[in-house]
């Protein structure tokens, strides 16, 4: 009797050799569909079938296809989530059910992927759903909490740029605006805070090479009243990111490159 046919797999650069019957041991999986096609045409010149998946988790996939429910699983939640992701990709339903059941029973985190029902599982008790009074349903929701206060700027995280001294005179307005007093807009990420602390411009060191921050600092340095405070913010990474410039007192400022800044 000839030996069962073997196949060599190249999973992310790691080589595995197993029986084709092992890969086809569970119906409806990725491998059963694969071997229904001309899979030999996908072999490389060394006779290996390349699979672009996680090679560190693939041994668990092979063990389950060989031993089925007798396969032991790790207890670490992170490893279980990685195996669950591979089980979903390879469409191994019994392995997916085992992992989701283990996550719900023993681990603290809920499964990341939508759960599927486990066979032969019967719900024996109804959940106790609290009854909410009608007056609470019709009442207005409580107001949202106030926005958090801006974090204090540490001296080591700021760079000071000397600026002109404000004009002194009887009619001159002495307005001192602190950079820390400008609150951040909601649902935005704070990239840089540019403002005047009474003697110099303050802004984040990380943004010193940013062209937008440089223009803002140049414009603030050319201001006559020296009361401009700017925030540079973004939202949703690069999708909705933009700079927001806030001028406390009106007036027109010119940056050093001649661009008008309002």
From Swiss-Prot:
Coiled-coil annotated spans: none
Pfam families: BTB_2 (PF02214), PBD (PF00786)
PROSITE patterns: CRIB
Domain CRIB positions: 182-195
InterPro entries in alphabetical order: BACURD1-3, BTB/POZ_dom, CRIB_dom, CRIB_dom_sf, SKP1/BTB/POZ_sf, T1-type_BTB
Residue ranges annotated for the BTB domain, each copy included: 5-107
Gene Ontology process terms (BP): protein homooligomerization
Protein name as annotated: Uncharacterized protein T23G5.3
